[in-house]
Every structure is written in C-alpha cells, then in structure tokens.
Amino acid sequence: MTLTVRVISPDKTVWDAEADEVILPSTTGQLGILSGHAPLLTALDTGVLRVRTSKSQNWQAIALLGGFAEVEEDEVTILVNGGERGDTINLEEARTAYSQAQTKLNQVPAGDRQAQIQANQAFKRARARFQAAGGLA
C-alpha cells in the first residue's frame, strides 16, 4: 500500500505523488506517516518534509513554512504557507541566506523581543531551505 501525498501552498501545488513514507515537521517534533496510519490533523512547523517515493526509494526534501497536515485513509494532505522542493533550491544561495540569518539572529539585542522573534523566524526559514537543498543533515 502507498500513500497519496499532496503539498499545497496558496500559489501552487508543490507536490502531488504516491509515496511509501512521509516525515512531517510537526510543532511537537518529527512525525512519521506510513500506510494505514490513524486519522490525524496536526500543525506543522517551519522545517523540512521528507517523502520516500515508491518508484525510486529515495527521499525527497521539501522546505515548508508552517501549515497543517491531515492524514486520512492513506491520503496525506498538507496545506502550507509556503513550500519549495529541495531539488529546485540553489544550494549556494541557500547556504548564504542561512549564514546571514544566523548572523542576524546572533546580533539581535537581548531586550528586543520583536526583533528576536522576527530573526528566529527568518533563521528557521533559511535553515529549512538549506536543509532541503542538501546543505545540512
């Protein structure tokens, strides 16, 4: 048995294919989904979705910018604020953005809560893109 996996962002369908396994970046940690999984609705954090396809048995990475996932009857529907397949991300650009976001996060003044939140979100986005592109394990 396989899963039907759809990743949908406001402006495009990021992924629509069969898969053997999915690993979701939920707000409470990584969540593995296999065929026959119990029905589930969960919030997703900014991070990397990993999909193991039936055809190649290779893992495909997709950077997600938060959203929700629903699992029901071997169908995984993922609605995200933004998503980008790892194989479409330029690794060097992602590496540069990750490094810059990390530097900015480290330079935020300790008392500026709003700046800390914004820098942390930018860092999480940059890290997800860099990981999906293959830059971080």
Swiss-Prot record:
The keyword Ion transport applies. This is ATP synthase epsilon chain. One of its GO terms (cellular component) is plasma membrane-derived thylakoid membrane. One of its GO terms (molecular function) is proton-transporting ATP synthase activity, rotational mechanism. Belongs to the ATPase epsilon chain family. CDD domains: F1-ATPase_delta. HAMAP family: ATP_synth_epsil_bac. It comes from Nostoc sp. (strain PCC 7120 / SAG 25.82 / UTEX 2576). It is found in: Cellular thylakoid membrane. Produces ATP from ADP in the presence of a proton gradient across the membrane. It holds the Pfam family ATP-synt_DE_N.
